[in-house]
Amino acid sequence: MNYFNVEYPDLCGTTRMWVQRYEKKRNYHSKNKYFLSNGHELRINSLSLQKKKKYMEKTVCILAGARPNFIKVSPLVRAIGKNPEARCMLVYAGCEDDPTLEPSLFDDLQMPRPQYYLGVSSTSLNEITSQVMGAFDRFLDEHPVDVVIVVDDLASTMAAAIVTKKRGIRLAHLVAGTRSFNINMPKEINRLVIDALSDYLFTAGVRSTGIANREQSENSQTFMVGNILMDTLRFNYSRFRRPTSLPDLLEGSYIVFTLNRKALIADTDNLALMLQAMTEAAGPVPIIAPLRGLARDTVQKLGTSVQIIEPLSYLEFGWLTAHAKGVITDSGNVSEEATFNGVPCITLNNYTEHQETVSVGSNVLVGEDAEKLRSAVSQMVSGEWKKCALPDRWDGRTAERIVQILLA
């Protein structure tokens, strides 16, 4: 008995169904007779079937839960689009009019906009989880897929992972094995759940690979594919452009400051001390901060000399960080970009899920300690910074490896 995967039209459109080919069974001697799982005969020309088998597309669904996810999956979307054996369905958990998705984002990344939007909008993590589970389940009712790829550690990511696994669909986690080892963090819970459910654990570095290998279930596989963010940076580096709002900015003469972490923003007394230490240590070196929302409002109210500007496009922000004297951030992605660019970076946290940026790269952790921040900024301004290198597999071929694994 031989099995082939063919496309068969039914009431829901074109779907994939397993058919069984019987050669010399009872009174059936024709090699062109096939039977569906329900026993009905299906006649297909054998040559046509061989072609379908050879060129059968695998449908890969990528779910993005927030703006940073698109930056990571853009090379994967392009890689799948170039492969005749795969088809990509890009889904966004949010709304089509999400203000964080600036009009230029998808053009900057040279990727298509999502074909589907789940329309979820809430500030409650538990509500996001439940809404995404319901919406994604309905989406899969109407759109059969072979594998679902989820990214990072958001509530929407975890929700989609649960729905995928309950449906028996293959699940892949991009940037698996990252840990803070703080179970009180919602994102840490998300990571643990997603990794435990995933069939494919795609890791970025040696440390995350070790964690994934230790924790993986017997039915999952870990692949150290590399850092997908580096694919995006390498693809776009020559396309970075100077921000139009900063025409006179001199390369290497400024510090970039980003702020997003809610806990850090909420403690305004300590944040005020940190901002004061940062600006005093920087001296005449300007600190440029492309901030939005609550972070912008809070820093403005504290009345510092930080130069707050409007949020930048992806290509403009890439130029700003690549040509900075240094970067101060609470973002893991920004610290990775700084290491790639060889730019000194200070992370406002006691830990990082991207340990390679500290052990090999240009990143230093100062926590939320104003005096540690003051000391680190002084070293940054004076040029007294450690030497750094690129971690293993930051070579821009991560998306290529992932597609090869999924289609093997």
Located regions from the model:
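Short, Lys/Arg-enriched N-terminal segments with co-localized hydrophobic residues
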Residues: 44-55
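Serine residues within intrinsically disordered or low-complexity segments
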Residues: 30, 37, 46-48
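Short terminal hydrophobic/aromatic SLiMs and anchors at protein ends
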Residues: 4, 22, 29-32
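Nucleotide-activated sugar donor-binding and catalytic core shared by glycosyltransferases
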Residues: 56-285, 294-408
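Cationic, low-complexity basic patches in intrinsically disordered or flexible, solvent-exposed regions
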Residues: 8, 21, 34, 42
